């Protein structure tokens, strides 16, 4: 990695600010490898493996993988990991003109499931002096406030169909990336750079959880633990809203630059072309949950706006896409 000054960033990217640049390690003729490993007392294991070497005189290869197995600081009942990330990359590089330049083709695949992003909410009582008190024995940071069943029913805003959303897949992101990188310095001192990248993201999902005021209910309020209404619930509840974000991304970019030094002056001519297309939609739903670790989704009476009879029914999920 490297740091660009505001002036350099303005010239190369059009942004007047400090910018961080990243460089790919194409490798070397001798076989070289590196392994980093980390763990913590919650059971997280993380390793990063990279190796490279030469093929013949003017060819280099590089490959590597990043793996993260992070169960988080509390157990999620619907999955083993709060963050399960996998990244694989490989590349092939040709050295040009006895070291005057190179051309390299790189590929990267990433797959990340990170339900920990939406699992950090917690109920508590704020004392006022910076400290908090527990609610119903709930221990923030060590207990999960995500429903135990691991799935929701929602109405797809694109076609109106009732579907089931799985907590684990709802936070999934997958991507494929191909990059062509080249750099060559001519005998007259002129240097030419050309970099191009294409990225396709077939799955780019995210989840937002919202809440409301915590209140206490009795059997007379009509909340039950079963669909038949035979098991009334009494205790603390919180009305919750959930937004399910679904996306697909296609992007491409290339940058080319000619530069040459004339005495104390540097002349630079370049072109940047960037393309980004996002196919995005969001569906939302409401539900009422118990206030406890691994809360239960309660049944209550609600009306479906698409029902021509407008008859109230006992359901766990309601208020779709409102």
Task: Identify the role of each PLM range.
Residues 18-20, 211-212, 286-287:
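Glycine-rich, phosphate-binding/catalytic loops in enzymes
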Residues 31-35, 61-63, 101-105, 192-196, ...:
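Transmembrane beta-strands of outer-membrane beta-barrel proteins
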Residues 5, 37-41, 67-71, 96, ...:
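Transmembrane beta-strands of outer-membrane beta-barrel pores
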Residues 80, 84, 89-97, 102-179, ...:
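Acidic/polar loop-and-plug regions of large Gram-negative outer-membrane beta-barrel proteins
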Residues 173-203, 234-322:
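Face-selective signature of the C-terminal outer-membrane beta-barrel domain
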Residues 46, 70-76, 112-118, 192, ...:
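Outer-membrane beta-barrel proteins
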